[in-house]
From Swiss-Prot:
Protein name: Protein C4
Keyword terms of this UniProt record: Host cell membrane, Host membrane, Host-virus interaction, Inhibition of host innate immune response by virus, Lipoprotein, Membrane, Myristate, Phosphoprotein, Suppressor of RNA silencing, Viral immunoevasion
Low complexity: bias regions: 44-57
Entry's localization field: Host cell membrane
Expression tissues: Expressed in vascular tissues, and especially in phloem cells.
Subunit-structure text: Interacts with Arabidopsis thaliana RCH2, ASK7/ASK-eta and ASK6/ASK-zeta.
Annotated function: Major determinant of pathogenesis that affects the hyperplastic response of the host to viral infection. Mediates the induction of cell division in permissive cells, mainly in phloem. May act as a suppressor of RNA-mediated gene silencing, also known as post-transcriptional gene silencing (PTGS), a mechanism of plant viral defense that limits the accumulation of viral RNAs.
Species, as recorded: Beet curly top virus (strain California/Logan) (BCTV)
Amino acid sequence: MGNLISTSCFNSKEKFRSQISDYSTWYPQPGQHISIRTFRELNPAPTSSPTSTRTETQLNGGNSRSTVEVLEEVNRQLTTHMPRR
């Protein structure tokens, strides 16, 4: 059998883990039944209602946000302004 490849990806809210099985060196025997199942897990669609609250504090006369909040805002702006094909 082939190798088992395991990769991990992290974001600020969830931990993702995916495994890919590589059976490229395996050959079926004559008359052997083969069943291949594939699946894909989709992220839930964003909702219009907020799922978290944002807190801004005054720091030296200006508003301060965490790095996660800034990155989430940039990601939101990028996804809403991307041209659709």
